[in-house]
Amino acid sequence: MADRSAIQLIDEEKEFHQSALQYFQQCIGNRDVGLDYHVISVFGSQSSGKSTLLNVLFNTNFDTMDAQVKRQQTTKGIWLAHTKQVNTTIEIDNDRPDIFVLDVEGSDGSERGEDQDFERKAALFAIAVSEVLIVNMWEQQIGLYQGNNMALLKTVFEVNLSLFGKNDNDHKVLLLFVIRDHVGVTPLSSLSDSVTRELEKIWTELSKPAGCEGSSLYDYFDLKFVGLAHKLLQEDKFTQDVKKLGDSFVMKGTENYYFKPQYHHRLPLDGWTMYAENCWDQIERNKDLDLPTQQILVARFKTEEISNEALEEFISKYDESIAPLKGNLGSLTSQLVKLKEECLTKYDEQASRYARNVYMEKREALNTKLNSHISGTINEFLESLMEKLWDDLKLEVSSRDKATTSFVESVAAGKSKIEKEFNESMETFKKLGLLISNEEITCKFSDDIEERIKQLRDAELKAKIGRIKKNLVPELKDHVIHLLSHPSKKVWDDIMNDFESTIKDNISAYQVEKDKYDFKIGLSESENAKIYKNIRILAWRTLDTTVHDYLKIDTIVSILRDRFEDVFRYDAEGSPRLWKTEEEIDGAFRVAKEHALEVFEVLSLAVTSDNVEIIPDVPMAEEESGEDNEIYRDNEGVFHSRRFAHILTELQKENVLDQFRRQINITVLDSKRSIITTRTHIPPWIYVLLAVLGWNEFVAVIRNPLFVTLTLILGATFFVIHKFGLWGPVVNVVQSAVGETRTAIKDKLRQFVVEDHEVKESFEMKDFSKNEQKEK
């Protein structure tokens, strides 16, 4: 409940209550309120439930109407009540501020009739002295002019601006629109947009005083919207909605808190009473509030009503009539003209009886609404036409004879055709008055077509680059790997010559002159140069990746070993070498090693034959911005260079040489082992002794054909084995055969012993059983 009963601050005779200050003192007692108070007013049509809303929301006790007895004026003049209790969804423990609530006499009441002077002044007073003005309206009133008090608000805005608009402070008033009986069919956002548009339109039409010509509605007011359910039919939801509304009056620090500092008048409470009385005196004496005349108001209301009815009928017929014709220009334009003329004719028949200036003003507004509605269909038709024409263009470009028609020619012809047909359709709408201005549509169309052509050009370029890349990359890789796997001292000269020739061969079809290319898709010289540069970047990156991926430590060691063995194992004619002495091996070793190491430095650093480091003529990566990025450290703590020419670090070079030395040393040792048998000299007297002692056997062998044959076979076998140094494999075979024979013999002996042991055990078991039987 309120702290005190409400008092009539301004009575129905427009007199300000002189005991207001005493009332405030009674409400606050001995407390020093200072600036910690707030003023709220409610404004709206008579019998719309304003007092009821205040009583439920702020626990006040304003008089309310008993609808079961009679609908009549309850609040007369302006009443004031004090409260600290706001109905909220949660309990607030902190000290609540003092709130003073003004219940303003309802507008459009039958008791005052056409005398609207008091309701205008009361509304203006409420705006002038309040922080928050609650505008109470029913959902069905939105869109009306009188029913939702828009005409009154316009007058109040105008006079408020003339009286208080020149103040230099930043004071504002919050207009809180409380939409009653909101059932939710129409979203609150849609309703708020409608009211906001009406308010903004009213503000632009105001007669502003000097110095305020450029002012905006939002320089003086903030707008908020809240929907409340039906109090009788949805009582629980209504109560919950009111509590949610109450949260915004007490929840400080939240985004939806209504009592913002810029709304407060920054006056002590006793100063506010003086300020309020002075405002009422100024409003009461101002004669400009007696505007406009009832005739003009009626004309505006009725013409707006007729306009809305005509527009609603137009919209109701529109979709059904237009939908089947959207693809046919002739039928569509005829139907649009027919619907528009029917709508304007209906408006003219009824609205032309009112004041001509108001009638023409509303007719122009109706015509604008019709054109706005029709423009959506026109835009939809033109967009559909654009899509169709664009599909035709893409088909023409893709199916063109590439041998006779270039991409540029095909696109240019298609673009000209599209523009011609599009402009013809747009002119048809314009001539019939269905399209007021075509500048925006033309600009949008031009931008759209340019963007689509750019996309088509990009796709064509991407396809060309893809074809170039498909051939260029594998060719470069194959050629480079082949040259590096069989390197010479001039391998980098060969690689760079092959690199340039491969690029040139793949893009020769687009070359117009030296270092100038035209990729034949309608690009400028600089754009073509950029594409050429990108191709070179692709080629350089491929070369860089191929070289550094291939020339790893193991690969370089393998290349050096192959070069060593080519000279060490084979002579100049390519025949295998047969070693006789160690000196011969050592000499060949030195020559082969020198031959292998000739290319070691070449494979470590990419330089030309004249000792110039190979440096790419294009940036290799986006992050290349200076020398700071040329050196990096790997996971093992080794520093590397990002520069293309630097292949091996000093540490890696030492690693390569160590592995290479170990491998070639093993090769040399194997070769020396092969001639060990030739170093063993048999004494000559052994041959004489063999001849003397074995003469008889020799004669016996010669005389026996079998022995001769075996001797020849064994001799040939011995010669082949000795000639090709196969004693090692023969020894291995013999050892393997002997081992297998030994294993077989052991298995047989083991089997024999086991079987013999089993037989003995069998006999012993029989003898043991016989002895047992005898003992028994």
Curated annotation (Swiss-Prot):
Localisation: Endoplasmic reticulum membrane
EC numbers: 3.6.5.-
Stretches that traverse the bilayer: 682-702, 706-726
Recorded GO MF terms: GTP binding; GTPase activity
Cytoplasmic-side segments: 1-681, 727-776
One example of a Gene Ontology biological process annotation: endoplasmic reticulum membrane fusion
SUPFAM superfamilies xrefs: P-loop containing nucleoside triphosphate hydrolases
Lineage top rank: taxon: Eukaryota
PROSITE patterns with a match to the protein in the record: G_GB1_RHD3 (PS51715)
Binding locations of GTP: G44, S45, Q46, S47, S48, G49, K50, S51
Keyword list, A-Z: Endoplasmic reticulum, GTP-binding, Hydrolase, Membrane, Nucleotide-binding, Transmembrane, Transmembrane helix
Keyword Acetylation: no
Family from the record: Belongs to the TRAFAC class dynamin-like GTPase superfamily. GB1/RHD3 GTPase family. RHD3 subfamily.
Subunit relationships: Interacts with RTN1 and YOP1; GTP binding is not required for these interactions.
Name recorded for this polypeptide: Protein SEY1
Organism: Saccharomyces cerevisiae (strain AWRI1631)
Gene name of this polypeptide: SEY1
